[in-house]
Structure formats: C-alpha cells, structure tokens
Amino acid sequence: MQHSGNRRVVAACARCCGFIHSVPLQLEVIFGESRFAPLLAALGDLPQRWQVSAGEGPASVVRCAQGCGEIYCSEACRDAHFQQSHNLLCVGPLSEDHPLLRFKYHALEHADTLLLAAQVFAFLINRAKAAGGGPEVTRNLMQELLCFCHAPFREACRPPPGRAKDAEFYAHTDGLVNQAAALLRAALEPHAPVEVGALFQAGSAFFSEVLGMFEYNNIDLEVASPMGQLLLQRAKALSLSDGQALAELQQMEGLLREKEWVMRCVWGEETTGIYGDEVDEDSSQPQEMDTMMQAMEQGNDEQVVTAAMAHARAEVAQMSLEQLLQGVWPSMHGTGLFSSVARMNHSCAPNVKVTFPGNSSRLTTTSVLNISPGDELCICYVSQEADVQTRRRRLLEYGFTCCCSRCLAEDSTALRKAQKRLK
C-alpha cells in the first residue's frame, strides 16, 4: 500500500504500487499546488510528447468506475483490486457521514496501517464468502493469517521519540484502535454480517493483532521513478542546433528547476513514511521538508520557513542542466506484508537483501553472500549502517537482544576504545 503522504508527489497504482505510465499525470501530482499552474500551462503538449518519445504510447489512466479517485496502471489491476477488497472499501457512492468515510479520515489522521488493516479485513470477507461463508470458515482464515509474529498493537507499536509507553500512551493507543475498529465494523457489517461478526467476535482484539502483525513484519516498499531517465533520454535526443529543440530543452530545464525546489521543500518523513532513526542518513533525496513542515505545523515564525524556502531556491539556481537531469525524482514509498520475508529471521550480517526491481511492488530477494545448501536465509530487520547500540535498541521492539558475531565484534571494539580513552 502506498503511504498517504506519498500520494502528494507520486501517482501509483492502488493495487501493484507501480508508477502510472502517464507523464502528464505525474507532473500534475508533483506540481499540484496552484502556484505551479502557469508552469504546467506553459508546457503545453510537451508532457504528452515526452510520453510518446519514450515509447510509452499515449498517456492513459485507469480510474475506479465508481468515482472514488483510486487510480490503476491497468484494467487488470483495477478489476483484481475490486475483487480482492475494493468492492467493500470504495467510498465513491457514499455520503460524507458514512462510517467507511469516517474510518478513512480517522486512518489518515492517525496511521496508514489502519487502511491496510481494512484491506485485510475486506480480503478475508471476500475469501470467506468465496469458500462458502460462515463463522467457521472466517475463523480458519483468521488463524491462517496469525501464523506470523504478532501482538496487540499497543505492545508492538513504537511510541514517538521521547514518549514513554506509560498508562497515558496505552489509553491513547487503545482508544485509537477501538474507534477505528468500531467504524470499520459498522461499514462492513451490512455487506457480510456473519463473517464480520466472526472477525469482531472479541471486539477489537483481532483488529489490534493485525495491526501489531504489521508492526513486526511489514517492510518498506520503494519503487524508483521512471521520470528522471525518461527526461534524460529525451534531452540527449534533442539537437542544440535546432531552434525548436532548444526551446523545448529550455522549458525542460525550467521544469527540472521547479522539481528540484519541490524536492527540497516537500520531501521527507511525510512523503516517504520513514520516520526518526529509520531514515537512511546517506540518502541522496533531500530532507529539508521535515524542518519546514514542523515549523509550519507548530505555528513558528513564518520568516524561518520563508528563509528556508529561499535558501532552497538559491541552491537550485546554482545547478547546471547536467546536474538537473541527474537529479532524483520522488520514489513511490509504501508498506506491505510479504509472507516469504515475514518468515525470515534476522542477522546484522544478512546473506540476502530485499529489492523491488521494475515498476511494481513485486519483491525479489537477492543473495549478498555465498549461500550453501542448508544455510538459513536471513535479512536485516533494521538499518545495517546503524551502530551496534542503535541496532540493538531497534531490535528490542522485536523482542530480542542481538548477539550475532557482528554485534559481539563491534561490542569488543567499542570496549577497547573506551578502555583506551580511560588510560
């Protein structure tokens, strides 16, 4: 599932999370603010021509037939999504006071994974009904899902930085989950009262367990944007001796400068869904948004925000066309539960890594070390670049203290350095 904040800058398929093959739409999304209307208008039909020049064919977008706003990369993805869960979760024909809409507003305010849990519940209902329906079939599917590591959400979730898991935190978390579960139950019950009754037989307990399962097992999805390579190839194909081609290149340069400014102003935790010490410190994608967004949300001095945006504009003005063409475009960021990865154990020196090649959320595991028959495949649950203390702190959330060979070696190194400083 694509993170809700990421939808502000990337148009991705609601089912497979691949980029929508429409240059005009991708530009409309990233330049969605009214201030960019003149920029898009000045481009005219260039985005469509760039689309065709890349061999993509005319831009086309497949939308939900019921008008909810969901978009897809193909009719096949749209139809499959509708059959799996969207038939029960589409808000297109609903009134503003419908519990499903209220649930989605609640989820957008508090946690994206509430939306993913709703997809799981709708999927279970559809599977149960396809298998004949009834409470027993539903309960069997529930047990099948809980074969993965799980716990109530209040135990599995990570509190914000500086916040302790105290009575106030537990009360807030339980209230959030209970309200979401009540709204979702009210939304789904008219469609399948027997199956929904089984899902909520213990109140919000199963809903909370599913959310906890996501906390322990979900991995971050990242699908690279095709926009950068598309425009780079187009720029290389233009002849600088041709006046029309030169004019097109100048318009492309103006677009790229605005994109770089947007990346510096609106790219960060909100649009990636990666918070706190999960952020890769070596990431090439700018993180200036975090400070500016926090300043705006907290009502801090508007001059601070204005100055930061002006600084970003000045930085972009110094970039050459070659640098602009090499610049990063927003990736699709999301979260997902993958059964194969959810069954893998942790190692701080893993022998496989997870990647998402191509334009979709299809997962591939690739070996990073030599693997012999009988070896266990392990991934790293946390950032491999983090130091041993940070890794261990994060791994405590999974319920264990790591004592692998790498951790022990780094412990010894840290101890020797500390002893040397004391001498």
Go through each PLM region and give its residues:
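Short alpha-helical interaction motifs and adjacent low-complexity tails used for partner binding
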Residues: 1-423
